[in-house]
Amino acid sequence: VYTVFIQLLANTEKNMFKQDIKRIGWACKYLHPDQTQKTKILEELQRPLTERATTVAWLNRQTRDVAEQRLWDIMVHNSAAAKRLVEYVGTLIPELRMVRLGSNQLPCATHADWSYFWTRSDVVAYCDTHYRKVGDAARALDVRISMHPGQFVVLASDNPEIVNRSIAEFEYHANLIRWMGYGQKFQDFKCNVHIAGREGPAGIKRALQRLSTEARNCITIENDENKWGIEDSLELSKDLALVLDIHHHWCREGEYILPSDDRFKRVIDSWRGIRPAIHYSVSRADVLDGHSDSVRPNMPTLLAQGYKKGKLRAHSDFMWNHAVNDWALEFSPHADIMVESKMKNLSCERLHEHAQQKTKVARPTGVSNSDAGMHVRNVRRGCIRAKT
C-alpha cells in the first residue's frame, strides 16, 4: 500500500510545472514574428500551430458523412496543433513557457445536434491518445498550460438552463484536461471563468457541487470588470483558486492595486501553495491616442474627459504603456502573468524584454559593464532563437 501511495504521489508531482520560475504567458494563438508578410503567407506559417474551426450552420448544410469527416479532420489537426504549440513554447526561455490553449479544440462539442459525435468510442479513443501527447509535451518541457472557456459560460446565472449549458461547456474543457493527464490534483491545471451572472458567489458555490472532481481541481474564478469585483470573488477563496485580473480591477475601481494589498494576499492563499496566475491587459493605444507611455492612465481623469469605460476595457495590441508595465511586473515575484493582448506571443515577448531591461539596471556588485553587456546580449540571443 505504501509503495502504491508513493507512486501516486510521484505521478501527481510530475504533473506540476516548476514553481520557482517567474513566467509570462500568452493566450491561444501563435503569431509569426514577421507580421509584415502577406496574409496568405502568414496563414501558411501559422496554420500548423493554430486551431481550425467550423460552424453549426455549415455542418447542418452537409450530409452526415461529410459533416462527420470535417469534424474528424478538425480533431486530428487541432490535437496536433496543440502539441506543436506546446512544443514551440517549450523552445522558449523558461520564463516564457506559459500558454493558454484555445477552447475550440473540438467544435460544437456541446451543441445538441453534434455532441453525439464527440462521444463516439473511436473519437474518444483518438482524443485520449493524442491529447495525452499534448500533456506529456507540456510536462516534459515544463510548459504551464491553461484554458479559459468563453464568457457565455455563466455558472452563476439565475437561469437554470444557462447554468446547465455552462456546466456542460466547462465539463467539455474538463474532458480535454483529463485526456491531457491533468485534473488529478488541486491546480495542476488552470481552467478559468469569470464570476458572471446575477447569483454571484452563491451561484458559483452551487455550481461547484455539480462539477466533476477534475473540473473542481482546475477551476479558477477571476474578478469581473462590471458587477463582481475582487471583494466578491474573495467570498470563494476557500472553495477554489482565484485569479486577479488587474485590468478588470482598474476598469471597475480605477485603482492600481498593489501586490502588498491584503486582498491580493488572500488571492495568493486561495492557491494553497501553488504559484498563482494573474491576468494583465491594458486599454488600447488608439483609444488613448496621445497618452504618454511613461504615465499611468488615470481613470477619474479619463472619465472626466469623456472616455467611456466600455472602450477602456478593450485589450490592446501590445503592452504599450511602460509605466503600467512596471506596475504589472511588481506582481511577478508572487504570480505568473498571463498577457491578454491582440498580438499574443509577440506582445508577451516585448513585455518580457521590458522586464529584462528593468532587471539589468540592478546589476550585482562586482559585475563589470562588459560582463553585464555580455549577459544582456546572451539574453537577447535566447529570445531571438526562440522566435525563429
Model-derived regions, located:
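Histidine-centered catalytic micro-motifs
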Residues: 145-153, 243-250
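Core alpha/beta catalytic barrel or barrel-like domain that forms the active/cofactor pocket
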Residues: 102-103, 145-150, 184-194
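Eukaryote-skewed repeat-based solenoidal scaffolds used as protein-protein interaction platforms
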Residues: 163-241, 247
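Alpha/beta catalytic barrel-like cores
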Residues: 15-144, 153-167, 171, 175, ...
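Short, Lys/Arg-enriched N-terminal segments with co-localized hydrophobic residues
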Residues: 1-15
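Active-site-adjacent pocket scaffolds in enzyme catalytic domains
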Residues: 222, 237, 241-244, 252-259, ...
